[in-house]
């Protein structure tokens, strides 16, 4: 029911007829419940636009919402925040995607000065202080870029087309669905034809590659023979390929050696110092010329950043990362800041070539900048590394923490506790703990189901409304 206010006493409906006493009373009550103005209307508060809801963006948002009176707009192409260190568990069916993610709109509903805008950044206009998204334009007083990095295929379009990345929740679900489809299809084939569909090649010897190889090996040992008895004659192999001479290159030598021994114990084939050269969907070719026949290449071999339209080439440093000063603002734009993987800060004496592209760094930078923009600190940003850890398999992991090198059960327990406590909400922590307990005691994964929407479902739904 629409109303037209003609003076302080009389209200008319859309047909210009006076409202009844009941209608007028109801209209007054509804009007009293509405805000005097929309938060998108003119506002004298400083407007901070924050692009990216990853570790850096969320930590920065928490501090800004807590300490500042600024008006904040959070921009992300996805309407959820997720916990990247556990996406490999989603790809293996140990966890549901909802166990490690949380809706952004529900998250920001606790903050009166924060609004969410879904969209992908297309360009920045530093002169006019505006950004262009695929969903429209937004003006800003301060801009924070924390949009993270993308999977790095090192310019190889063939790899980008055929390899399976593991960077996002969508990637993890694609891997899960792909592998289940491969297992099911292989079960219908003669034994001699199954190998390429069951063999898995993982590119990248960092934590993501090692943890994925470990969990896939665990599925082979504890699950596959029960769920796919027809595949007992040939369950395929797992090969981990890395360009480095060791696994977990940033970690201690003792952790590297222990990881290598455990991988070999789990019957994971290891290939060192021989990066992937090409992959056509059927055959992996390494730099040495060695070939591996597989339909399953999972890519965890690094990340890269993209150039942002509107910024100049001198704004970028090595790896297409934005050059920032000691307060994380762009060298040439003091009203634009960068955080996380996309930021390159060279002022820190301990990291003269820039901080590593890690979640720890992103979280630390986000917390710092939120406090800095809220006036809670004026010191320069300095990063203190807390340590590294990696899960290898059931009851075994490695951890380098404050000079101590843990391995085996102790490292595994530390890894489990730290990762559970790092999840966003109590619901995430409880769900993850429960699903891990079920998998641990029963040897079964609850989410080994291939559930995919029809590829044209959204298109058909949209067209039906036209």
Regions found by a protein language model. Give the residues of each.
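A conserved FAD-binding loop/helix module that cradles the flavin
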Residues: 345-384, 389
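Short glycine-rich anion-binding loops that position phosphate/pyrophosphate groups of nucleotides
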Residues: 56, 148-151, 213, 303-305
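FAD-binding core/adjacent interface of flavoenzyme oxidoreductases
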Residues: 4-11, 16, 26, 30-45, ...
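A Rossmann-like FAD-binding core segment of flavoenzymes
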Residues: 112-123, 217-326, 332
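C-terminal, flexible cofactor-proximal segment of oxidoreductases
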Residues: 4-5, 24, 30, 34, ...
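FAD-site-proximal beta/loop scaffold in flavoenzymes
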Residues: 161-193, 282-285, 291-364
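Beta1-alpha1 glycine-rich phosphate/pyrophosphate-binding loop at the start
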Residues: 2-9, 13-16, 22-117, 201, ...
């Amino acid at each position: 029911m629409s109303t037209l206010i003609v003076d302080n006493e009389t209200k008319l409906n859309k047909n210009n007829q006076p409202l009844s006493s009941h209608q007028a009373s109801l209209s007054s009550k509804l009007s009293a419940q509405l805000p005097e103005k929309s938060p998108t209307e003119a506002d004298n508060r400083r407007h901070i636009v924050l692009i990216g809801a990853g570790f850096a963006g969320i930590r920065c948002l928490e501090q800004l919402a807590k300490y500042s009176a600024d008006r904040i707009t959070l921009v992300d192409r996805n309407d959820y925040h997720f916990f990247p260190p556990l996406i490999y568990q989603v790809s293996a069916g140990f966890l549901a995607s909802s166990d490690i993610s949380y809706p952004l709109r529900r998250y920001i509903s606790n903050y009166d000065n924060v609004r969410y805008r879904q969209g992908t950044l297309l360009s920045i206009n530093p002169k006019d202080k505006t950004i262009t998204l695929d969903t429209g334009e937004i003006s800003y007083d301060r801009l924070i870029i924390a949009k993270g990095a993308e999977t790095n295929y090192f310019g190889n379009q063939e790899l980008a087309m055929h390899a399976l990345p593991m960077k996002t929740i969508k990637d993890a679900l694609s891997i899960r669905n792909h592998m289940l489809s491969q297992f099911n299809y292989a079960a219908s084939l003669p034994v001699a034809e199954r190998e390429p569909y069951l063999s898995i090649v993982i590119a990248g010897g960092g934590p993501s590659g090692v943890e994925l190889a470990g969990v896939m090996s665990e599925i082979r040992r504890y699950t596959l023979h029960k769920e796919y008895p027809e595949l007992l004659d040939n369950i395929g192999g797992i090969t981990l390929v890395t360009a480095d001479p060791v696994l977990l290159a940033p970690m201690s030598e003792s952790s590297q050696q222990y990881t290598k021994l455990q991988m070999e114990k789990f019957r994971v084939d290891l290939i060192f110092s021989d990066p992937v050269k090409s992959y056509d969907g059927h055959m992996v070719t390494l730099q040495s010329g060695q070939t591996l026949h597989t339909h399953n290449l999972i890519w965890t071999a690094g990340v890269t950043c993209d150039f942002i339209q509107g910024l100049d080439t001198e704004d970028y440093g090595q790896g297409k990362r934005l050059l920032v000063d000691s307060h994380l603002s762009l060298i040439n734009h003091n009203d634009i800041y960068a955080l996380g993987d996309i930021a390159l800060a060279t002022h820190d004496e301990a990291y003269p070539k820039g901080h590593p592209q890690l979640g720890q760094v992103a979280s630390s930078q986000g917390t710092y900048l939120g406090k800095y923009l809220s006036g809670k600190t004026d010191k320069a940003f300095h990063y203190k590394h807390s340590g590294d850890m990696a899960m290898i398999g059931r009851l075994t992991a490695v951890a380098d923490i404050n000079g101590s090198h843990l391995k085996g059960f102790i490292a595994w327990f530390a890894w489990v506790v730290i990762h559970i406590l790092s999840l966003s909400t109590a619901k995430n922590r409880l769900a993850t703990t429960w699903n891990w307990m079920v998998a641990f005691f029963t040897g079964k994964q609850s989410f080994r189901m291939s559930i995919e929407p029809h590829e044209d479902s959204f298109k058909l739904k949209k067209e039906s409304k036209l």
